[in-house]
């Protein structure tokens, strides 16, 4: 894992790891079940998932693709690897602890990439998105799933500092960073409607 001087709130995920699957993951289940569908996966596709956590999303991936799944939190990855040992995944998964700001992959390695509930908790979301673009092939799809409102509002402004302290992330203008990065926004869909205000943003590398 590459070291750098960015501050990460990964320590709190050591506390969340034992309870994540039971108490937190269900609120994200709708988005997790949908986020691979826009990729229109083909046999042999190589996918990157950034911020894989305990691997709860990987049960939705077919067995004919290969996935590199990264997370900064080793306690979360321990849970994900345990799932793999138990045979929970059909696809071939390679788990790695890694800082998403400095992805340890060569350019144009992946056919498509997904990142769920991660860009709002990293120190520099635009840097991370640019790194994901770098390692994804031209014309590849990048799917972003995250808690998102176009406008933060008064309650959002009040709640934002507490979200950050709890490791739940900060308000990020995803459409703005998508535009800044030069991605083409193909589609957006509200997901996790009952429990959170989340959106799935489907982008294409031009």
Regions found by a protein language model. Name each.
Residues 1-42, 56-57, 79, 86-87, ...:
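Conserved class I S-adenosyl-L-methionine
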Residues 3-7, 24-26, 143-199:
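C-terminal alpha-helical "lid/dimerization" subdomain adjacent to the S-adenosyl-L-methionine
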Residues 42, 122-123, 136-137:
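Helix-to-beta-strand junctions that scaffold the AdoMet/dcAdoMet cofactor pocket
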Residues 45, 140:
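Glycine-centered, small-residue-biased loops immediately flanking beta-strands
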Residues 48-102:
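Class I SAM-dependent methyltransferase SAM/SAH-binding core
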Residues 101-112:
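A short acidic, Gly/Pro-enriched loop at the edge of an enzyme's catalytic core
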Residues 112-124:
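A short SAM/SAH-binding and catalytic strip from SAM-dependent methyltransferases
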Residues 126-138:
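A short glycine-rich, Lys/Arg-flanked "PGG" loop and its adjoining helix->strand segment in the class I
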């Amino acid at each position: 894992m590459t070291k750098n001087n960015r501050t990460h709130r990964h320590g709190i995920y050591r506390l969340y790891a034992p309870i994540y699957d039971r108490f937190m993951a269900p609120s994200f289940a709708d988005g997790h079940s949908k986020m691979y569908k826009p990729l229109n996966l083909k046999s042999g596709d190589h996918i990157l998932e950034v911020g894989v956590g305990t691997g709860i999303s990987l049960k939705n991936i077919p067995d004919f693709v290969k996935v590199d799944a990264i997370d900064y939190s080793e306690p979360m990855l321990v849970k994900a690897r345990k799932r793999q040992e138990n045979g929970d995944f059909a696809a071939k998964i390679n788990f790695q602890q890694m800082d998403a700001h400095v992805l340890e992959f060569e350019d144009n390695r992946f056919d498509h990439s997904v990142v769920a509930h991660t860009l709002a908790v990293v120190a520099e979301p635009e840097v991370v998105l640019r790194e994901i673009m770098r390692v994804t092939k031209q014309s590849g799809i990048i799917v972003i799933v995250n808690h998102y409102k176009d406008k933060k509002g008064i309650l959002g402004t009040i709640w934002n500092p507490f979200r950050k302290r709890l490791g739940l992330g900060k308000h990020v203008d995803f459409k703005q960073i998508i535009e800044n990065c030069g991605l083409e926004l193909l589609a957006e869909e509200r997901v996790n409607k009952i429990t959170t205000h989340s959106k799935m943003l489907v982008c294409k590398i031009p």
